[in-house]
Amino acid sequence: MREDYYWYWVNNIVGMSNAKLKKLFAVFDTPEEIYKASDRLLESVNDIRMSDIMAIKESRKDDYIYRQYSDIEKQGIRFTYPGQINYPDKLLNIYDYPYILYYKGRLPDTDKPSVAIVGARNCTEYGRMIAQHFGENFAGMGLQVISGMALGIDAAAQKGAIKNGGYSLAVLGCGVDICYPRTNIELYTCLLYTSPSPR
């Protein structure tokens, strides 16, 4: 199995939260070590319950995760994880950083400056116009515009960046294969997007 698969597997174990993964990675260096660990070794991990160990064991036998892994490749969904050259190092500075980022397109260039523009969904027309203006101007200055693709300020800023030929990326709370809100489907197809979840 490839290292990528083990990362995908550990991120898709039913009930396995970031907090539990952090406990596992305090003991194991890689997802492959978790995959191959004995029950006794798994039981030695602080705050990992028997139900978590059962979920790990079940996920090893279930080919559903492997099928999902194959499917995302066919859909053009890729992912990165800590230690990969394209994983955004700045994320490692936050306490609860994601172990996997799913994305389509390309991730931001870490050697170029970025700006985040976020705001109200229910904004005034003036606010929407100013957000689009900022997006256009920042893109014109070579800044990468990062936002959330929500209605209102987020979408307006990204539309402005795209209009000016700039790079814009949406960080999604849902899977990268889901356009939410649906009214932003045109923006969704233009953007390069990333997400902590594949679906």
Regions found by a protein language model. Name each.
Residues M1, Y81-S195, R199:
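Glycine-biased, small-residue-rich flexible motifs in mid-sequence functional cores and linkers
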Residues M1-G83:
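Short, small/acidic-rich helices and loops at N termini and domain boundaries
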